[in-house]
Amino acid sequence: MPRVKRGVQARARHKKVLKQAKGYYGARSRVYRVAFQAVTKAGQYAYRDRRNKKRVFRQLWIARINAAARQNGLSYSRFINGLKKASIEIDRKILADIAVFDKVAFAALVAKANAAL
């Protein structure tokens, strides 16, 4: 069996990792062994935070809706309950947007939700 040195594949693999580590500080962008660890950890963080992002944004929307609903004299839970009873199906992302940018329309939604309770 002939000896296999894998020089080309190793160089390609190292280049790929170092390209992904571009912009990292110090040895993390220059030394393969350190860069590999940094890129691997970055991938783990990215994977985890793609899932966390959904939770964080939902929390933000709920906080904004709650604040706007309370300004109109209704708690978040009663507001959502009223919307469901009035069969108004607007998701929390859009409700939060309306609460921030169109206070008149949000006040109308609160009135409808209050009437349905």
Swiss-Prot record:
Biological process, per Gene Ontology: ribosomal large subunit assembly; translation
Entry GO CC: ribonucleoprotein complex; ribosome
Disulfide bond annotation, renumbered to this chain: none
Single GO term (MF): rRNA binding
Keywords of this entry: Ribonucleoprotein, Ribosomal protein, RNA-binding, rRNA-binding
Regions that span the bilayer: none
NCBIfam families: rplT_bact (TIGR01032)
PANTHER family: 39S RIBOSOMAL PROTEIN L20
Function recorded in the entry: Binds directly to 23S ribosomal RNA and is necessary for the in vitro assembly process of the 50S ribosomal subunit. It is not involved in the protein synthesizing functions of that subunit.
HAMAP family (UniProt xref): Ribosomal_bL20
Entry similarity comment: Belongs to the bacterial ribosomal protein bL20 family.
Name of the protein this chain belongs to: Large ribosomal subunit protein bL20
